[in-house]
């Protein structure tokens, strides 16, 4: 792909502010760490990864090569980056407010939605930047302890990236998957996956 992944990961640069490069770098570092652990005799019985990390989980479980994982997530990053113009999307972590209350505040706001239910007391919202900022003010008024903007380059985990998801599905048709050596847990259903044929749809 012409990407100098070593320079990207180990040299100071501004490219990591763009999800096209961030995703490739994160998967590279994750899989390098996984290789070191295996060399030291630590091998997983099952893998899992959140969002982008699911690609690492699949690669670690034997479902795709590290090279394919890096190439695929770079394409994923490009599609996500192109879906929403730079600076127009945003994400924020809402701390200390019940999920039901957050859902209530966002119910009549079409440009912002919940991205992740991370854990009780920490929920991430995503959407158009202006809508996320307005929702942040409303959530603080509703009792949120804090609403922290996330340092991301787009409105990830939102319906604004629906077209990118469709295009990624086409890209995944070209990826060589292998039979899983161990199960992994998918983000979509939180269930074990043992059949690689289900992976393309779940991603």
Question: Residue spans of the language-model regions?
Answer:
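Structural motif
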Residues: 47-50, 115
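Helix-rich "cap/lid" substructures immediately adjacent to catalytic or cofactor-binding pockets
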Residues: 1-48, 125
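A broad detector of short, well-ordered amphipathic alpha-helices
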Residues: 28-35, 54, 67, 71-74
């Amino acid at each position: 792909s012409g990407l100098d992944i070593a320079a990207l990961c180990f040299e100071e640069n501004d490219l990591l502010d763009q999800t096209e490069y961030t995703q490739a770098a994160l998967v590279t570092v994750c899989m390098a760490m996984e290789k070191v652990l295996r060399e030291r005799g630590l091998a997983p019985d099952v893998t899992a990864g959140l969002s982008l990390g699911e690609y690492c989980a699949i690669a670690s479980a034997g479902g795709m090569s590290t090279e394919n994982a890096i190439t695929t997530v770079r394409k994923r990053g490009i599609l996500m980056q192109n879906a929403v113009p730079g600076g127009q999307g945003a994400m924020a972590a809402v701390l200390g407010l019940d999920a039901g209350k957050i859902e209530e505040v966002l119910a009549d706001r079409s440009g912002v939605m919940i991205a992740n239910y991370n854990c009780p007391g920490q929920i991430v919202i995503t959407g158009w930047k202006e809508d996320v900022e307005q929702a942040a003010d409303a959530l603080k008024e509703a009792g949120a302890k804090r609403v922290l903007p996330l340092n991301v380059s787009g409105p990830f985990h939102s319906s604004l990236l629906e077209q990118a998801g469709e295009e990624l599905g086409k890209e995944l048709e070209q990826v060589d998957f292998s039979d899983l050596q161990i199960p992994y847990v998918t983000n979509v259903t939180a269930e074990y996956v043992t059949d690689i044929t289900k992976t393309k749809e779940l991603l």
